[in-house]
Amino acid sequence: MHFRAITRIVGLLVILFSGTMILPGLVALIYRDGAGRAFTQTFFVALAIGSILWWPNRREKGELKSREGFLIVVLFWTVLGSVGALPFIFSESPNLTITDAFFESFSGLTTTGATTLVGLDSLPHAILFYRQMLQWFGGMGIIVLAVAILPILGVGGMQLYRAEMPGPLKDNKMRPRIAETAKTLWLIYVLLTVACALALWFAGMPAFDAIGHSFSTIAIGGFSTHDASVGYFDSPTINTIIAIFLLISGCNYGLHFSLLSGRSLKVYWRDPEFRMFIGVQLTLVVICTLVLWFHNIYDSALTTLNQAFFQVVSMATTAGFTTDSIARWPLFLPVLLLCSAFIGGCAGSTGGGLKVIRILLLFKQGNRELKRLVHPNAVYSIKLGNRALPERILEAVWGFFSAYALVFIVSMLAIIATGVDDFSAFASVVATLNNLGPGLGVVADNFASMNPVAKWILIANMLFGRLEVFTLLVLFTPTFWRE
């Protein structure tokens, strides 16, 4: 294990991260909201930490293998999440405990969107901008992590793809080097962000809010600059714009890359994961619209459809924006939408959850077993697109599902043990392990009422969800540390 080379990389990341404090610092200057000191302090502290880690090891160029890759990925999120908590700790408004500061930082960086803050409308603009920025940078990291790095390590939904499928693979990357891949992906990411911000601005959203919500929309994060979330703007047009960009961001970025490379829009519909993703969204929209209309929750059919469309896409893509309190909806719908987050977005997207591709393969395997009951001697292969998948891939899906279920059950029991009621414990684990954000019960609006121990468990869940479980679990195996 090349610890010095790993330390050099982590130090460099912290130095780069310190530079991002300049942006909220400028916002503090523009709005004169008094929050600039917190970001100035964080800049110098982060720069010092990064320099201490990087300078003594700056000439270490040891060849990094997959084991080092796992450790670097985990350290990337844990170290930056910890440094990201500093502005919340240094800031006088909001006055957060250390636990809440870490919760807010990790929630932002992992694009979970769960919050302990109340009174967002009265917070300094710089703090509000910083929360949105955390999610946006987290989303940039997720795209490269999901599409370029984890497949090389043999982890993540993208490893399920093979040569004829769009997107980078272990044996067929978009670009020969991660740096090249990252540049292409980030270009797409930035273009989508600019397009989203302009669309929201033209729809009547103030410039500050438009930029902030474009950050959290493209990152599928869910943080807002207002307590009422997107409902603050009370605009069906804004609801529709955000929902459309959430759907775009919930797609595999490999498909966006294919379109950017000159291929036709048909590349999307040829992808079985994309077809299932859209199918799930449409089915949920129809169900929600019919139930809301039957119960006369809204005055008109158009309002009902708009609210159903927005809320379904927001929850099912794991963004977690709200336009209305879904607690006043028939209980069936909030629970259905919470469970839809288990499916989440496509592999290679900023969405959370199990990922559509895994759910698709689980269904295909279930269907195969039913056929085998009728024809025990028949040989059935499972295909993705036009290619039969090897059993090793299918075993990996079941392995991931088992590990995910184990983490889910252990987390829920641990939170119940801290004194949280069972329904709220279930909802909080669903919201954090799937990187969704809002839950039900005592965490329907925010997580401020959760006890400190439960919050640390939920922080761990955010990391498990964002790092696709195995990336974090492998560090706890003796084999990983054995030379």
Swiss-Prot record:
It is found in: Cell inner membrane. The chain crosses the membrane at residues 3-29, 36-57, 66-90, 125-150, 178-202, 274-294, 390-417. Keywords: Cell inner membrane, Cell membrane, Ion channel, Ion transport, Membrane, Metal-binding, Potassium, Potassium transport, Transmembrane, Transmembrane helix, Transport. It is a multi-pass membrane protein. The keyword Metal-binding applies. Pfam families: TrkH. Residues 30-35, 116-124, 203-205, 225-234, 323-330, 418-419, 440-451 are periplasmic. K(+) binds at T111, T112, I220, G221, T318, A319, N435, L436. Residues 434-439 are annotated as: Selectivity filter part 4. Low-affinity potassium transport system. Interacts with Trk system potassium uptake protein TrkA and requires TrkE for transport activity. Belongs to the TrkH potassium transport family. This is Trk system potassium uptake protein TrkH. It comes from Salmonella typhimurium (strain LT2 / SGSC1412 / ATCC 700720). The gene is trkH.
